[in-house]
């Protein structure tokens, strides 16, 4: 029994040699962040981001955490330790005690590789609010399309050649070749999957760029040059996840932007919500002929006057739409105001010929619409409806007071001015102009305004 207890206690102790190695790796990341973080990416400070180093089957070492250690962690020199037999963790950006942290799974990495991986995951934390690719599209990506595979393989070889090129003219020419091949392939691939690739390059690709840029600064491997073989053979191992390809094409485009435009492109990419492909097209003058022709047309046809007329027309349209809403809601009869708590309101049926935009997020259904939310709500309107997606409300004049009927749990209920019903169940409202069925709702009446708050 004593031996078992001692074995359990020993198992809970952090492995001293590995902890020492991880502390060295983290110290290098800290120094890199303090001296060169902006050289990797504007505002990036990996030294300010806590790191969870996961030792599978042993425990988790937390370094760079400020303040008291989170619950379950015991102090060790320079950090905190939590024993664990968990083996299923992945390197990622995550949260601990409500704070963003980088998580690094420790295996057989060299010290420089650990530094790079820490920078990669810290960059994910730094960019955690950026738009991500729709990972579900992996399930429908055309992995058996040989033409798409060949196109992607060609893109990899062009990017590798651009990395090897030693003068800017050759780099710019190869960038244009890459874009021509990429855009041709993307036209066949379709908009959703093309966007998936470009967003994956911004997500995983830029994190990998940060890793390789760190290697370039510290003169440690891996560096951009170490990835040339991977670009040359981008599609060689077709058994691997396609997402891994963007770990190669993303940093390759980013480094090519470094070579062609210095480091100023990074701030623009964020400020203007661009993709790597967008910026590469600009700095390589890929669309120069298009831009020249557009400027020629704008001059020949007085574009400034056209823009002024468009601005005036849009302003008049916006004012007219608002007057339409005022007219619709000012019609005689009971005004229904409906909201839905805790979930989104869907359109189960609409008449596209009679659907008008009033403003950003505000719609006017001029004739007919069915709005729904699963079992919680079903409606049909045969009268104009104003749907405000920003406020989550629906407004419609639903007929004369005398023609609107309310039943609650199968019982007819009168709609008197000033009345209020809370948590009413099996609600049904109807008139010749609409029907509304809600599983649960609060209902109130003030003057001509009937408010229905549909509850989850």
Model-predicted regions and their roles:
Residues 191-221, 229-295:
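Active-site-proximal alpha-helical
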Residues 1-7:
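Sec-dependent signal peptide recognition
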Residues 70, 75-98:
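Catalytic zinc-binding patch centered on the HExxH motif and its immediate surroundings
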Residues 103-118:
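Short pre-active-site segment immediately N-terminal to the catalytic Zn-binding motif
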Residues 23, 27-34, 247, 267-456:
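Non-catalytic terminal regions of proteins
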Residues 117, 121-129, 207:
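Catalytic glutamate of the conserved HExxH
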Residues 56-60, 129-189, 193-228, 235:
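Post-HExxH zinc-binding segment in Zn-dependent metallohydrolases
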Residues 12-77, 108, 207, 364-366, ...:
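N-terminal mature-domain "stem" immediately C-terminal to a signal peptide or N-terminal signal-anchor/transmembrane
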């Amino acid at each position: 029994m004593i031996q078992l207890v001692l074995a359990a206690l020993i198992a809970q102790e952090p492995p001293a040699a590995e902890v020492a190695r991880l502390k060295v790796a983290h110290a290098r990341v800290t120094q890199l962040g303090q001296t060169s973080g902006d050289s990797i990416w504007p505002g990036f400070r990996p030294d300010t981001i806590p790191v969870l180093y996961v030792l599978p089957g042993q425990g988790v070492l937390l370094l760079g955490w400020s303040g008291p250690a989170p619950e379950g962690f015991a102090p060790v020199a320079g950090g905190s330790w939590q024993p664990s037999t968990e083996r299923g963790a992945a390197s990622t950006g995550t949260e601990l005690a409500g704070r963003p942290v980088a998580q690094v799974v420790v295996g057989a990495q060299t010290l420089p590789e650990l530094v790079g991986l820490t920078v990669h995951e810290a960059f994910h934390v730094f960019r955690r609010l950026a738009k991500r690719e729709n990972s579900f599209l992996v399930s429908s990506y055309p992995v058996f399309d040989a033409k798409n595979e060949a196109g992607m393989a060609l893109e990899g070889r062009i990017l590798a050649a651009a990395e090897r090129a030693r003068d800017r003219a050759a780099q710019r020419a190869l960038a244009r070749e890459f874009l021509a091949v990429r855009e041709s392939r993307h036209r066949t691939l379709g908009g959703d999957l093309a966007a998936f690739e470009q967003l994956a390059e911004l997500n995983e690709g830029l994190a990998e760029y940060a890793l390789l840029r760190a290697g370039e600064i510290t003169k440690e491997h891996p560096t951009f040059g170490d990835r040339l073989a991977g670009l040359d053979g981008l599609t060689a191992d077709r058994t691997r996840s396609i997402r891994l390809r963007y770990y190669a094409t993303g940093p390759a485009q980013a480094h090519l932007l470094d070579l062609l435009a210095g480091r100023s492109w990074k701030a623009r990419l964020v400020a203007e919500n661009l993709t790597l492909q967008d910026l590469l097209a600009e700095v390589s003058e890929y669309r120069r002929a298009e831009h020249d022709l557009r400027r020629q047309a704008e001059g020949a046809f007085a574009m400034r006057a056209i823009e002024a007329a468009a601005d005036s027309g849009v302003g008049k349209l916006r004012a007219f739409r608002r007057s339409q809403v005022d007219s619709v809601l000012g019609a005689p009869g009971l005004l229904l105001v409906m909201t839905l708590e805790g979930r989104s309101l869907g359109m189960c049926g609409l008449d596209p010929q009679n659907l008008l935009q009033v403003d950003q997020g505000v719609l006017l259904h001029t004739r007919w619409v069915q709005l729904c939310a699963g079992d919680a709500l079903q409606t049909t309107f045969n009268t104009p409806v104003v749907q405000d997606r920003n406020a989550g409300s629906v407004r419609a004049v639903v007929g004369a007071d005398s023609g609107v009927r309310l039943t609650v749990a199968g019982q007819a209920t009168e709609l008197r001015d000033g009345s209020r019903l809370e948590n009413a169940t099996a609600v049904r409202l109807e008139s010749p102009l609409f029907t509304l069925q809600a599983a649960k709702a609060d209902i109130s009446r003030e003057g001509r305004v009937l408010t229905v708050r549909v509850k989850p």
